[in-house]
Amino acid sequence: YEMGKVKTGALIVVEDEIVLTEYERTGIAVDGILTSQLLINIFEKNTPLHDGAIIVRGNRVVAATCYLPLSDNLALSKDLGTRHRAAVGISEAMTIVVSEETGKVSLAVEGELYRNIDEEFLKKKLSEGHLKNVENGKLIDWKRRLQNVKKAKEPSDK
């Protein structure tokens, strides 16, 4: 939501049960721990990694500048841009979109697009049971991960 405030566009694909290797290969390997600072640095305008999607596997950003299939769903609003169409097009994963034009956050899940969502809705969807993202045989705790990202945004007491 910090990126939305400054209208920095983003396309964040959260890998679920289906491994997204074919899309990962279209981008640049990152293999960095998922933090708000990493996301801000990747999607900063006029930087080499800002175009395309990132793929999140477990608690890591595995690749950036990835190409995704665009949805050809004619029911989608004509005012939606490429990021939103790509988010709906990759139905194998949950995808978070930050609009560069409006700063609004949307979420695509299983071909459905939830537009202009608030932080609570996003947290709820990320913590629901259908996100069975497994890393090293363990269920990823999305609530804990969201708390860690939030803590990374807070200034330290040092």
Language-model segments: residues:
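Divalent-cation
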Residues: 1-158
